[in-house]
Amino acid sequence: MILYEYPFNERIRTLLRLEDLFERFTFFLTQEDAREHHVALTTLFEISEVAGRADLKSDLMKELERQRQTLAPFRGNPGIEQSALEAVLGEIEQTLAGLSQMQGKTGQHLADNEWLASIRSRAIIPGGTCKFDLPSYYAWQQIHPDQRRQDIAKWVTPLLPLRDAAIIVLRLARESGQASKVMAMQGSYQQMLSGRSYQLMQVRVAPELRVIPEASANKYMLWVRFTVQDGDLRPRAVDVDVPFQLTLCSL
């Protein structure tokens, strides 16, 4: 099944973006070629932009603290697997400690590094990081891959508490949902939300159907409409019934 996810609010949208960026960053950082490490570095700049939202850190701390207070009373409950509960609570408490130790504006350490700032300003220009534009960057790209990885890992370290917090919040949200099998009649589906507040919607479709869900929602109702791509990859509305799995997630 192919999984599509749709955030219902700006906070979850930001966390999904962070998750995607960190996954890309990790993939390219583990590679060997200097061009792959260039992608890792430019992705780090993107992470800094997204993570630099003024209230992100405080939002994450509030949510983790709320989850900690929700889960802590289950300690000693015979109906709850205690080892799993303690693992989650320990993870939350460790991440809260990491967030509380973050000082200053998020990503400021990258802005304060003149060398990185010069690369960042050139990277937004198409072809702006050629060797004749940034000879010192080109020289750095010639050093051993392990040293490049070590440098990039050092630059990303101050941002890792945000990554860890995003992972926990998204995991708890995803685990809260229960998948149901539904049918989009003639490619369209709608469902009343009955006043319940959700943060995330998941749509799973069989790959052989080759359909693409487009979703929207408000506090009363959600809509899912399926399209297919024509020869020019442009979306075209589906006019047949489409089976899919729908999961609504709420923290």
Curated annotation (Swiss-Prot):
Keywords: Cell cycle, Cell division, Cytoplasm, Septation
GO cellular component, as recorded: cell division site; cytoplasm
Alphabetical list of InterPro entries matching this protein: ZapD, ZapD_C, ZapD_sf
Protein localization: Cytoplasm
GO biological process, one term: division septum assembly
Alphabetical list of HAMAP family matching this protein: ZapD (MF_01092)
Family affiliation: Belongs to the ZapD family.
Record note on quaternary structure: Interacts with FtsZ.
The protein's name: Cell division protein ZapD
Phylogenetic lineage: Bacteria, Pseudomonadati, Pseudomonadota, Betaproteobacteria, Burkholderiales
Gene this protein is translated from: zapD
